[in-house]
């Protein structure tokens, strides 16, 4: 049984992330594991905090969530860990062989600091499974009706095609394949066209609806977000890192920009070796 791990800090943003995770779990017949991480070093805490009372309060809140979402999906449970937020959530995902991690990007109790500035991509880059990040304060429909799949000239850009197709099949989504022409060189432009054609063939094989478009792009984060706004997207799928080429603008900082600034949920996929499309 596939499982979704959700980072919980009891903020509204983490509850919003939980709602999105439950929608996916229900559609895909998956289970949900909520994870709360106690990141406080009590020996250095200037306030008198009783860790036992703190853990009791957390367990009580989880019990309320279990009651609220009872029967909403295949199964829902919770895990309490001690340590660094990002590393513990990733460890739980590995231990449970999770399908994905879902987190809100501007929560409290550790997430807010964690997601700020240059640290925005840490949980995404540390995870071995896809990470769905959902920015707080934006009202995005949870059903994945329209998914944006941006493709550039790098080989690894295609590795997000299978998980996109799988999610699309659960929701009967329409995938918008966005060919990002970042160079005027004909060989690079041809390569992107070939990658888009491969994605089209894959989606045809999997009976996934799709639309293909090409745009000339100098700033792929802004251009992708502009396109997502235009089609009223529910999800953008990106890679966490890519090869370094003269045409590649989607380096780590750009993935971080997307995660931190996208008003749309972003699924970040870590490249793997020896994948066959």
Language model: regions and residue ranges:
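Small/aliphatic-rich secondary-structure junction motif
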Residues: 1-52, 146-213, 233-235, 261, ...
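Structural beta-alpha unit
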Residues: 50, 67-101, 205-236, 241-250, ...
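Short, ordered loop/turn segments at secondary-structure junctions
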Residues: 37, 106, 136-138, 180, ...
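Local beta-strand N-terminus motif with an aromatic residue
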Residues: 1, 97-99, 120, 129, ...
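Helix-enriched interaction subdomains in cytosolic or periplasmic regions
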Residues: 101-128
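Short beta-strand elements of ligand-binding domains
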Residues: 102-105, 130-136, 266-270
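Charged helix-capping and loop-helix junction motifs
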Residues: 116-119, 191-196, 250-255
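Short glycine-rich, flexible loops that bind phosphorylated cofactors or substrates
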Residues: 13, 109-110, 156, 244-246
């Amino acid at each position: 049984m596939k499982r979704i791990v959700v980072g919980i800090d009891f903020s509204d943003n983490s509850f919003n992330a939980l709602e999105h995770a439950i929608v996916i779990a229900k559609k895909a017949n998956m289970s949900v594991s909520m994870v709360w991480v106690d990141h406080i070093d009590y020996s250095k805490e200037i306030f008198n905090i009783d860790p036992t009372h703190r853990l009791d309060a957390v367990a009580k809140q989880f019990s309320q969530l279990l009651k609220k979402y009872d029967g909403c999906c295949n199964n829902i449970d919770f895990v309490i860990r001690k340590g660094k937020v990002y590393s513990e959530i990733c460890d739980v995902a590995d231990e449970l062989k999770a399908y994905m991690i879902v987190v809100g990007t501007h929560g409290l109790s550790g997430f807010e600091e964690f997601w700020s500035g240059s640290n925005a991509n840490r949980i995404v880059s540390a995870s071995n499974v896809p990470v769905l990040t959902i920015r707080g304060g934006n009202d995005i429909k949870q059903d994945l009706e329209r998914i944006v799949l941006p493709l550039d000239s790098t080989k690894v850009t295609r590795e997000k095609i299978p998980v996109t197709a799988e999610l699309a099949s659960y929701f009967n989504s329409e995938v918008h394949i966005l060919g990002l022409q970042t160079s005027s060189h004909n060989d690079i432009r041809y390569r992107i066209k070939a990658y888009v054609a491969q994605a089209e063939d894959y989606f045809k094989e999997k009976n996934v609806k799709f639309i293909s478009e090409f745009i000339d792009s100098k700033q792929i984060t802004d251009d992708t977000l502009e396109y997502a706004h235009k089609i009223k997207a529910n999800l953008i799928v990106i890679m966490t890192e890519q090869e370094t080429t003269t045409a590649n603008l989607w380096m780590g900082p750009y993935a971080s920009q997307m995660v931190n600034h996208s008003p749309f949920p972003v699924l970040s996929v870590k490249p793997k070796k020896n994948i066959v499309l």
